[in-house]
């Protein structure tokens, strides 16, 4: 069996075959380089988990030189050598997954937390609704599992679903023990909210600012820990990898200090990628500005396996600014109106105050997000309107203000009282259900590289994420990645000659400020063009012709942009925030389009008018294998892999 490889252009290439045990079933390639899993009788997780284990089973440390001065055991403090830092663990991202992992592994070695902006600026900090887990005696793990699988359009990995739903309550208790404060009812127990797709109340929350409270508690603990070193305003560029036969080994990451423009090389025994999603491939997203798909793109360039990128979740209810009495200035990210508003009885109306959700689904406003987003999209297109209305004003004022203080304050700031008026809402890009393929311990096919959070594809979400399962997944997988990471550190070593194995990226100072400013301006224009293409052609409802047109236009735009850069003195090893974000956005956009073109059915978040029905034989994950071909600057590492 040959592996299917997706390049930036989405073409199929073949490389050295990977052989499987005969019991694994027979994999098959679909169009556009996407390998869609296994025969129906083989569980989704069985093949994937075994693939990752087989790929990692014969670990051998790369041997390039025999006269290294190596460091065995753990590093007692942060070691540095010029612009190189040495750590036992490197963590990319400062959201719930990265911070929770850092606090655990810091008991066993030194940790670098590398974060692109301020430490709190993560998707976690913007999460409103809560964390789903079974705490109510009337609820059960089986019920939570069933809700997750139904919402995921039966593409979920059942083993992963069971693990997450079973371990979730204990992970939340750990957060509480660390100082996170959640809402409690009059009986003294945790107040449990209900959201769309859930059959029971099981959402643990802190009003409508749950993520902010979790981030606060975790950061407070991180800043107090002597073994954790936080590098803020450090933008991860590319992984440092070597190749030993068919094995890819990660030795750390290069990052640029976006305030000083110094490139720092982080050499580590283990790297956890927890960098979040890629919402900014679209013009309107609830994600913060840092969510430009950096981790997914870096992992793809480092030859990690990527999965299920066609499943982009559009949150049904982002605040529609143009419907507010006092329209705010342009935002960098859309303001989220949490799922819990509908869970608490919020009703969706069109602008004629006609309730429409019962026409689309018997669960009405409590249907899963993909159903609600498509229903709103259909209403807007049929009626030629730009937003719909979400009304919670029929509920007691005190209840509304106590449950949704953040939303109430934001709307009131712009002249709208949600206790008396409906909220204008519109779908916006929210969450990537696909990402870097991970096993049950967060392991990837790249040795020494683990993933957790939105950047990972664990199989939990399938074709559509159930509300409030994202923070839960991040907690569970951050914790599950700890022990294998510690085991890896204990048998690994840091070599202080390793820093010289790869050429160093450089800031583009030699091209001068005038030219650099021109490059940045053009890059920002290209970014808007890409976002426009993605929304127009790769949005909530898709078609083969529009996806094909998007693929063609994206590749043309990428070539035009790269040509512009190099005509203005840019070199392949140069790095800067805007340019590196842009190449990552191009990479992620291509992954989404290639994956979408390969799925010839409508399932969950992927709805195409050319294949409008679910096809049971296609209930398989989409897998993008790494490409050896470097067709563009965006698709290759800035430094070549060191071959052992």
From Swiss-Prot:
Binding site for FAD: 94-97, 116, 123-130, 294, 454, 470-471
Active-site residues (renumbered): 369
Gene Ontology terms, MF aspect: L-aspartate oxidase activity
Pathway assignment: Alkaloid biosynthesis; nicotine biosynthesis; Cofactor biosynthesis; NAD(+) biosynthesis; iminoaspartate from L-aspartate (oxidase route): step 1/1
Gene3D superfamilies: FAD/NAD(P)-binding domain, Fumarate reductase/succinate dehydrogenase flavoprotein-like, C-terminal domain, Succinate dehydrogenase/fumarate reductase flavoprotein, catalytic domain
Reaction equations catalysed: L-aspartate + O2 = iminosuccinate + H2O2
Keywords: Alkaloid metabolism, Chloroplast, FAD, Flavoprotein, Oxidoreductase, Plastid, Pyridine nucleotide biosynthesis, Transit peptide
Signal sequence extent: none
Protein EC: 1.4.3.16
Residues of the site described as Important in orienting the L-aspartate substrate: 195
CC cofactor note: Binds 1 FAD per subunit.
Domain of life of the source: Eukaryota
Main location per the UniProt record: plastid
Disruption-associated phenotype: Reduced alkaloids and nicotin levels associated with a lower putrescine production. Occasionally, an early senescence and a lower viability of the older leaves is observed.
Function: Involved in the biosynthesis of pyridine alkaloid natural products, leading mainly to the production of anabasine, anatabine, nicotine and nornicotine, effective deterrents against herbivores with antiparasitic and pesticide properties (neurotoxins); nornicotine serves as the precursor in the synthesis of the carcinogen compound N'-nitrosonornicotine (NNN). Catalyzes the oxidation of L-aspartate to iminoaspartate.
Stated name of the protein: L-aspartate oxidase 2-a, chloroplastic
Organism listed in the record: Nicotiana tabacum (Common tobacco)
Recorded name of the encoding gene: AO-2A
């Amino acid at each position: 069996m040959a592996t299917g490889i997706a390049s930036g252009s989405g073409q199929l290439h073949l490389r050295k075959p990977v052989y499987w045990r005969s019991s694994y079933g027979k994999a098959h390639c679909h169009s556009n380089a996407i390998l869609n899993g296994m025969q129906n009788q083989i569980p989704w997780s069985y093949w994937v988990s075994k693939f990752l284990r087989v790929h990692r089973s014969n670990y051998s440390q790369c041997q390039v030189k025999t006269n290294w001065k190596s460091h065995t055991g753990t590093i007692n403090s942060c070691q540095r050598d010029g612009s190189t830092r040495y750590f036992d663990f490197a963590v990319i991202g400062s959201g719930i997954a990265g911070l929770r992992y850092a606090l655990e592994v810091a008991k066993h070695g030194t940790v670098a937390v590398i974060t692109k902006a301020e430490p709190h600026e993560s998707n976690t900090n913007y999460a409103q609704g809560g964390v789903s887990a079974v705490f109510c005696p009337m609820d059960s793990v089986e019920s939570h599992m069933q809700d997750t699988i139904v919402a995921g359009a039966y593409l979920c990995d059942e083993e992963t679903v069971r693990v997450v739903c079973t371990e979730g309550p204990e992970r939340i208790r750990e957060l509480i023990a660390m100082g996170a404060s959640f809402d409690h009812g009059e009986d003294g127990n945790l107040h449990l909210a209900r959201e769309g797709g859930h059959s029971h109340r099981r959402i643990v929350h802190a009003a409508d600012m749950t993520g902010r409270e979790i981030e606060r508690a975790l950061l407070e603990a991180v800043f107090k820990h002597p073994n954790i070193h936080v590098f803020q305003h450090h933008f991860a560029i590319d992984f440092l990898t070597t190749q030993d036969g068919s094995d890819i080994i990660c030795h750390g990451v290069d990052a640029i200090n976006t305030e000083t423009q110094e490139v720092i090389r982080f050499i580590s025994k283990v790297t956890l990628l927890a960098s979040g999603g890629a919402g900014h491939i679209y013009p309107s997203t609830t994600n913060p500005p840092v969510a430009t798909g950096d981790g997914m793109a870096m992992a793809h360039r480092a030859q990690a396996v990527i999965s299920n990128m066609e499943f982009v979740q559009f949150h049904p209810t982002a605040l529609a600014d143009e419907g507010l009495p006092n329209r705010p200035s342009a935002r960098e990210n859309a303001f989220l109106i949490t799922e819990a508003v509908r869970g608490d009885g919020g009703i969706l109306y069109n602008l004629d105050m006609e309730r429409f959700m019962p026409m689309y689904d018997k669960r009405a406003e409590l249907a899963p997000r993909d159903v609600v987003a498509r229903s709103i999209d259909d209403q807007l297109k049929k009626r030629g309107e730009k937003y719909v209305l979400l009304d919670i004003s029929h509920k007691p004022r005190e209840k509304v203000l106590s449950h949704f203080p953040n939303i109430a304050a934001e709307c009131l700031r712009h002249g709208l009282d949600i206790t008396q008026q409906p909220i204008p809402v519109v779908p916006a890009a929210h969450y990537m259900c696909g990402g870097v393929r991970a096993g049950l311990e967060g392991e990837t096919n790249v040795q020494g590289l683990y993933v957790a959070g939105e950047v990972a594809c664990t199989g939990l979400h399938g074709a559509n994420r159930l509300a409030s399962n994202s923070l839960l997944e991040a907690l569970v997988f951050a914790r599950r990645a700890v022990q294998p990471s510690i085991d890896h550190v204990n048998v690994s070593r840091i070599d202080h000659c390793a820093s010289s194995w790869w050429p160093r990226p450089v800031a583009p100072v030699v091209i001068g400020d005038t030219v650099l400013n021109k490059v940045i301006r053009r890059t920002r224009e290209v970014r808007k063009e890409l976002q426009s293409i993605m929304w127009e052609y790769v949005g909530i409802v898709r078609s083969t012709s529009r996806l094909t047109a998007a693929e063609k236009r994206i590749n043309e735009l990428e070539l035009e942009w790269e040509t512009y850069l190099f005509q203005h003195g840019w070199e392949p090893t140069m790095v800067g925030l805007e340019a590196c974000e842009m190449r990552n956005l191009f990479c992620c956009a291509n992954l989404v389009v290639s994956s979408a073109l390969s799925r010839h059915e409508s399932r969950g978040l992927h709805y195409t008018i050319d294949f409008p029905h679910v096809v049971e034989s296609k209930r398989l994950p989409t897998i993008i294998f790494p490409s050896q071909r470097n067709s563009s600057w965006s698709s290759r590492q800035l430094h070549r892999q060191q071959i052992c």
